[in-house]
């Protein structure tokens, strides 16, 4: 009997991390053929052939329509391709088969966030965290959704929890996100502290320099504001981020044009 392959994929999109969980053995009326399609889909996911993976998982599901892993992995491929509604539908199918499929809840939370369904994102991540309260990514997703709902202090709590669980992976982005929430909550000194932490970890983080510069300006420190914004513009240009560079340069011109 053929066994389904185990695949773990981590994809970084901004501050977000998506994980495919371990996969179980399959028993069906067409066990070999379904698993063959499934395993080929896994191989295609690993190779970055997302359309091919979708086709194979679809074939596997025609033979075994109650395979939560196949729905989950097809949803993953659809997510990477930007097919968000299809991804949500497949994560929902995976959860119909297995209501405790924590990664399906977490990834559906993420897709809800991308499609600006912030309340639904919070609901899914809250359910996921009830099943696995040690998954930093779910706190990040929920924090992002709460921040966009204007619940900045609750977002700060989620980012703080993520930082306590995250280890070293992606901490520059989490400090940055928490700094933004502090900015929006009117706590500029706390925001400044987090931008400092973010830049200690990643000294080439152009956006962190930009927002730290704006924070210095709000705190009345024009000299440091200009220095950070100029650094942001230089870094952004070197990284091909023309939009960020233009914003930083415009902010410098605006500050320099004002009377002290």
Give short role names for the model-derived ranges.
Residues 2-260:
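Alpha-helical tetratricopeptide repeat
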């Amino acid at each position: 009997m053929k066994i389904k392959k185990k695949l773990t994929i981590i994809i970084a999109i901004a501050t977000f991390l998506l994980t495919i969980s371990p996969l179980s053995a399959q028993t069906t009326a067409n066990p070999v053929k379904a698993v063959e399609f499934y395993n080929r889909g896994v191989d295609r996911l690993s190779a970055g052939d997302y359309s091919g993976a979708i086709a194979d998982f679809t074939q596997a599901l025609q033979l075994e329509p109650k395979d939560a892993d196949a729905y989950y992995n097809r949803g993953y491929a659809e997510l990477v391709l930007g097919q968000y509604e299809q991804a949500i539908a497949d994560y929902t199918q995976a959860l119909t088969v297995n209501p405790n499929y924590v990664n399906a809840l977490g990834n559906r939370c993420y897709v809800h966030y991308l499609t600006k369904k912030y309340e639904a994102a919070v609901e899914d991540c809250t359910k996921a965290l009830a099943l696995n309260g040690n998954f930093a990514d779910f706190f990040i997703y929920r924090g992002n959704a709460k921040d966009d709902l204007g619940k900045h202090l609750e977002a700060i709590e989620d980012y703080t929890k993520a930082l306590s669980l995250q280890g070293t992976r992606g901490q520059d982005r989490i400090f940055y996100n928490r700094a933004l929430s502090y900015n929006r909550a009117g706590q500029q000194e706390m925001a400044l502290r987090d931008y400092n932490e973010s830049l200690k970890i990643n000294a080439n983080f152009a956006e962190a320099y930009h927002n730290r510069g704006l924070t210095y300006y709000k705190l009345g420190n024009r000299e440091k504001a200009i220095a950070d914004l100029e650094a942001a513009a230089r870094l952004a240009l070197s990284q091909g981020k023309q939009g960020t560079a233009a914003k930083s340069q415009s902010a410098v011109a605006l500050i320099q044009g004002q009377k002290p």
